[in-house]
Design a protein with these regions (language model features):
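Short strand-edge motifs at loop-to-beta-strand transitions and within beta-strands
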Residues: 435-441
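Extracellular Ig-like/FN3 beta-sandwich strand-entry sites
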Residues: 348, 409-411, 436, 446-450
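Short, glycine-anchored, charge-dense loop/turn motifs used at functional sites
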Residues: 416-424, 451
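Residue-level detector of functionally pivotal "anchor" positions at catalytic/ligand-binding pockets or at interdomain
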Residues: 373-392, 405-407, 422
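Non-cytosolic beta-sheet module surface loops
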Residues: 236-238, 293-294, 403-408, 443-445, ...
């Protein structure tokens, strides 16, 4: 028979939970053990009380007896079904080198809700490789403003590549038992390439032995579909400034002739990791709230978010700033593997998020918050107050003037960035006197669009950062 759960490898990890607003129930998936002791555990709440009774099931991880186990679960739901994806890893192999393939479980929700003796499910494995390379890490696409189906989409990329422009769109078209059962893979090409992100820098001001926070890779970690459009996020290198940024992709015309575009949000003095996103309403376009962990050489690890209004990003909101560095192991510090994000169904526009921050004892702190569009829309105004600077005229065609104040005389480097965080013009370094300063810049060579003028002193402190529009 199969190995029992009673063994030294008996520990639980990677819990994933989702609320079903149509059935007013909860579904949970978690893993138990590794190698030959690996089990996938499914839980379905009997009522809308997650503290109440549940119906539990388990499936053996090494179902094919090929010395692989199931790792890194991700879940989504349609009207009738639960979808679970994960990676098959060889016994005693690392997640990097032991990867064999990604598989999909398609499960009837009603079996779990009704306490059926066994779960009725379909397993999708041996998914066709592209150029002899298996797709790795399929991220299920959640419904944005509602639960959809019967079709279920998944997205993926080449998460370990230094640079790549390929996005995979995978579709399971119908329910278990349907005659329409052909899984399809569409290979898309994005104009803006992504790349495996660097590890997150930590603040070494008080201890120069502190190691970086690992970003793992650039896999897609969150996605939703609304109005025939998919939005997704992953961590990526920003080649413009060398930092770890957030790659935000948009797949349009999903059901007919899909195309993909991408932008990168980054801050040169910060590194971002483990992003997620949720739909936050339609105000002339599908909006979203993107949350992520952040860290930097001048900041302790914390939890942040931005708002995407359908065309551009807001400034960054620091939801929970860290109290200290993270230092719990030898060498590079673990940072992931997830953050959480969930649309608040009773009030679309609000999102619940959870992530990591550095505690005073140098350990991991978890922080959960409800945020909404008003919280993020006010970030730009708050930052304007902090830097007490302004740019005028705005919009402008040829010249802008920057007015700001500094507390001491100092040298300041001025640069211009586009809305993706890419530096487009390093202007010059100039001496700024104590008190008020007024400096003029030529913006005529810039293409029309929105930009950010940033001034940073020799210590790396941001003196001013102001948006402007080149007409």
């Amino acid at each position: 028979g199969l190995p029992t759960v009673g063994n030294p490898n008996n520990y639980k990890y990677d819990p994933k939970i989702i609320y079903d607003p149509e059935q007013d129930r909860f579904i949970c998936v978690l893993l138990n053990g590794t190698n030959q002791f690996n089990w996938i555990v499914f839980g379905f709440s009997q009522t809308n009380d997650p503290a109440g009774a549940w119906n539990f099931y388990k499936l053996y991880g090494d179902y094919a007896a090929d010395t692989t186990w199931f790792d890194y679960p991700a879940i989504s739901i349609t009207h009738n079904e639960l979808f679970l994806t994960g990676n098959k890893i060889t016994y005693n192999g690392s997640w990097q080198t032991g990867f064999r393939q990604t598989v999909i479980y398609q499960v009837k929700k009603s079996d779990g809700y009704n306490a059926a003796p066994v779960l009725n499910y379909q397993l999708w494995d041996s998914i066709n490789p592209i150029n002899n390379v298996y797709i790795r890490n399929l991220c299920p696409v959640l419904g944005g403003g509602a639960i959809y189906g019967p079709e279920q989409y998944f997205v993926s990329n080449r998460n370990l590549d230094i640079q790549n422009d390929t996005i995979f769109l995978v579709k399971i078209p119908d329910t278990i038992g349907s005659t329409n059962t052909n899984l399809s893979i569409t290979v898309l090409q994005t104009p803006l390439a992504y790349g495996v992100p660097p590890d997150g820098r930590q603040n070494t001001t008080f201890d120069n032995t502190i190691e970086d926070l690992t970003t793992n890779d650039g896999r897609i970690l969150g996605a939703f579909i609304e109005s025939d459009q998919i939005q997704f996020v992953n961590a990526s290198l920003n080649t413009g400034n060398g930092s770890a940024g957030i790659y935000h992709g948009v797949i349009s015309n999903v059901s007919s002739s899909p195309t993909v575009t991408g932008n990168i949000f980054s801050v040169d003095t910060l590194d971002f990791g483990y992003p997620n996103l949720s739909f936050s309403g339609n105000q002339g376009g599908n909006t979203s709230i993107i949350s992520f962990d952040y860290t930097g050489p001048n900041a302790f690890a914390g939890l942040g978010a931005i708002y995407y209004d359908g065309s551009q990003f807001s400034d960054m909101l620091k939801i929970r700033q860290g109290d200290s560095v993270i230092d719990v192991m030898t060498g590079v510090q673990r940072w992931g593997d997830y953050t959480g994000s969930q649309t608040y169904w009773p009030a679309i526009g609000k999102v619940w998020v959870v992530g990591i921050y550095g505690k005073k004892n140098r350990g991991y702190g978890n922080y959960m918050a409800e945020i909404g569009i008003p919280s993020l829309a006010g970030v730009a105004n708050e930052q304007q107050k902090k830097n007490a600077g302004k740019v005028f005229p705005n919009p402008a065609f040829d010249y802008i003037q920057a007015e700001f104040s500094v507390s001491t005389a100092q040298q300041v480097d001025f640069s211009i960035y586009d809305i993706t965080g890419r530096m487009v013009d390093k202007l010059y370094t100039t001496y700024c006197k104590k008190g008020a300063n007024l400096i003029q810049f030529n913006i005529a060579p810039l293409a029309k669009g929105s930009y950010v003028l940033k001034g940073v002193n020799t210590d790396g402190a941001i003196i001013m950062t102001n948006k402007f529009i080149r007409q």
